[in-house]
Curated annotation (Swiss-Prot):
Keyword line: Cytoplasm, Nucleus, Proteasome
Pfam family, one: Proteasome
Domain of life: Eukaryota
Residues spanning the membrane: none
Entry keyword annotation includes Nuclease: no
Role: Non-catalytic component of the proteasome, a multicatalytic proteinase complex which is characterized by its ability to cleave peptides with Arg, Phe, Tyr, Leu, and Glu adjacent to the leaving group at neutral or slightly basic pH. The proteasome has an ATP-dependent proteolytic activity.
Organism in which the protein naturally occurs: Trypanosoma brucei brucei
Cross-referenced InterPro entries: Ntn_hydrolases_N, Proteasome_beta_3, Proteasome_bsu_CS, Proteasome_sua/b, Proteasome_suB-type
Major localisation: cytoplasm
Name used for this protein in its record: Proteasome subunit beta type-3
Disulfide bonds: none
Length: 205
């Protein structure tokens, strides 16, 4: 078993019309043993940036703290919030810095420009190689199932409510096919005007 799948868990980011959704499951485990059913993997960086982290839980926590420190330092130095593409570049460079002793995490990043409504999605591997599609990105133990569900359900120009419905159905259906993810999910729905968090009930078995 890969160390990336040891703690289980999956994340998905999906783009719509001037909005995006980042969604993660709630399971934390040690291989097939479930430790907790209330461990979401989303990190709200600011009003327009949400990051999901999958991989080894200890590295998720440490890496999230280091990312938070770097973004706060950026805010102090630049006297403004970091934008989406700069944040993705920051995360990618932090992972590449540690390439010889890597963080066992796979970030999924969703961002929106508050003025223009432009959505930017990015996912990286554990050494920071970015993937920047226009529709959706996913990572975690049920990434293959998520890809299939997203290909079937996603379409361009989805409004926030439709996008949430599609992302939630994709996550729940994919988790039903994976024993290392599941136990419900949590979603962050982000538009130009607001950020809303929703809890999604799922199977508890």
């Amino acid at each position: 078993m890969s160390i990336l799948t040891y703690s289980g868990g999956s994340c998905l980011a999906m783009a719509g019309k001037e909005c995006f959704v980042v969604i993660s499951d709630n399971r934390l485990g040690e291989q097939l043993k479930t430790i907790s059913m209330e461990v979401p993997k989303l990190h709200v960086i600011n009003d327009g940036i949400v990051m999901g982290l999958t991989g080894l839980r200890t590295d998720q926590q440490t890496f999230a703290q280091k990312v938070n420190f770097r973004t706060e330092m950026y805010k102090l130095r630049e006297e403004r919030d970091i934008n989406g593409k700069a944040f993705a570049a920051l995360v990618s460079s932090m992972l590449y810095e540690a390439r010889f002793g890597p963080w066992f995490v796979e970030p999924v990043i969703g961002t929106i420009d508050r003025k223009t409504g432009e959505v930017y999605l990015c996912a990286t591997d554990l050494i920071g190689a970015p993937c920047e599609p226009e529709d959706y990105v996913c990572a975690g133990t049920c990434a293959e199932s998520l890809h299939g569900m997203c290909e079937a359900l996603w379409r361009p120009g989805l409004e926030p409510e439709e996008l949430f419905e599609v992302a939630a159905q994709a996550m729940l259906s994919a988790c039903d096919r994976d024993s290392l993810s599941g136990y419900g999910a949590v979603a962050a729905i982000v538009t130009k005007d607001k950020l809303v968090t929703r809890l999604i009930k799922g199977r508890k078995d």
